[in-house]
């Protein structure tokens, strides 16, 4: 894991634009947490971590519900990717948006010393060993949402037993499909529940609030079929 972070730093040194943003943002992450801590008045922190934009959309329905039902908690939203951070750094339903400090044992320990994190939510594929172990040591209830597991993943290979143990650090794992749940239970991970892809919850809410768009209605008028393509 440390090798991966050194490669990122090397890429930043050679001028890779995204790597430079990532390294610069993560270098300031701990200081940003300390500064924010002074404004939280000791309120418990609910930490949600998403890798990038897509994972944020999976966390979004949960954030909206938590913001509504638990207003006394401070919500921290972290990103690994610069694209996620840049797009959502002013997201109004959380109290703080920050980069995830590089996942080293030292940073994980410092983050949990700085912030009174009461609950942590990781999205889909976020399995940072240093953070998961630190959260477990602190007794923080940690959840994984919108996860998908497949037989070829490291957890289920003969040399991946250490990573399989990481899954036991989660209090509950919410997966997208029955196949993922069965695979986990086959390997002794029983705290699992099929909950689907949380992005659909947001899509349903958007559909309920949809407004008529005359330009679109005019475009599709009389058509038997309409094909909509995105990110092509």
State each model region's role:
Residues 1-10:
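N-terminal, charge-rich interaction modules
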Residues 9, 13, 17-209:
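Active-site and donor-binding regions of nucleotide-sugar-utilizing enzymes
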Residues 2, 124, 150, 213-216, ...:
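Serine/threonine-rich low-complexity intrinsically disordered regions
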Residues 35-42, 215-225:
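Glycine-rich phosphate/diphosphate-binding loops that line cofactor/substrate pockets in enzymes
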Residues 44-52, 220-232:
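Conserved donor-binding/catalytic core segment of Leloir-type glycosyltransferases
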Residues 204-223, 232:
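ALDH superfamily catalytic-core signature
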């Amino acid at each position: 894991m440390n090798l991966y972070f050194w490669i990122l730093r090397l890429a930043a040194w050679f001028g890779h634009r995204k790597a430079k943003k990532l390294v610069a943002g993560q270098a300031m992450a701990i200081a940003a947490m300390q500064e924010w801590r002074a404004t939280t008045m000791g309120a418990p922190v609910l930490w949600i971590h998403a890798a990038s934009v897509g994972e944020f959309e999976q966390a979004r329905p949960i954030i909206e519900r938590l913001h509504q039902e638990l207003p006394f908690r401070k919500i921290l939203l972290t990103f690994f990717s610069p694209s996620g951070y840049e797009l959502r750094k002013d997201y109004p339903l959380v109290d703080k948006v920050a980069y995830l400090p590089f996942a080293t044992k030292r940073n994980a320990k410092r983050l949990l010393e700085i912030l009174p994190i009461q609950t942590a939510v990781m999205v889909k594929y976020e399995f940072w060993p240093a953070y998961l172990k630190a959260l477990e040591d602190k007794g923080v209830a940690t959840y994984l949402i919108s996860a998908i597991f497949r037989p070829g993943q490291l957890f289920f290979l003969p040399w991946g037993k250490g990573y399989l143990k990481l899954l036991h650090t989660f209090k509950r794992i919410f997966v997208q499909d029955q196949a993922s749940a069965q695979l986990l239970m086959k390997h002794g991970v029983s705290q699992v529940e099929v909950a689907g892809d949380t992005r659909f919850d947001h899509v349903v809410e958007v559909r309920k609030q949809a407004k008529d768009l005359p330009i679109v209605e005019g475009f599709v008028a009389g058509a038997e079929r309409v094909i909509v393509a995105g990110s092509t």
